[in-house]
Amino acid sequence: KLWSLTTDYDFEHSTCEWLHPAILAAKANSEDNPSWEEAMNGPLSDGYWESANKEVKTLEDMDVWDVIPRTSDMNVLPSTWAFKCKRFPDGSVRKLKGRFCVRGDRQKDGIDYDSSEIYSPVVSWNTVRLLLILSVVLGLQTKQVDYTAAFVHAPIGDLDVFCEMPSGFSEPGCVLKLKKSLYGLKQAPINFFNHIKGKLEHAGFKSNDTIDSCLFISD
């Protein structure tokens, strides 16, 4: 019985004893999610610096922001780095990733976001199951697509949003004026949904709001 794994045993010390050690070697820990200071001063600093450079270049190539002079009337949001060390099952490093984010928890309603326009639809699992069943019954192929840097494809919207420049790449007296929906913003999910909805509609698809607004159908 599955429940006995957690109710009858100490998972960390009993159940795991018979699991292959390689499975546990890749277990996430705080060292695999370092802060900027920890990443730049740790044993993997070269790799993290390379990932940060790659992230900034990607965002600049996508025209995510303008660098402008700071003024006293701006609500400048803090920014942060989210680093991640991905490992192979044996614990060795597979990939180092850095993502530049905005501190959306510091946004102010009516200033840099609208609290009435931040809900983003999420696909129902019933819809996913139905499509998979239909693909099997009808002998159709299914494809899964992953958007690279998904949110930052979407325009920021009407409100001005400012944030601090990335640690390691700052310019004195300057801030970023966002043009795209950087990760961390409260409105980023709905902005991306509206963006991809427009793209799908342009390609001839229509959203089925009656069943699932995340279900798009083409004639």
Language-model segments: what does each one mean?
Residues 1-219:
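Long, low-complexity, charge-biased intrinsically disordered regions
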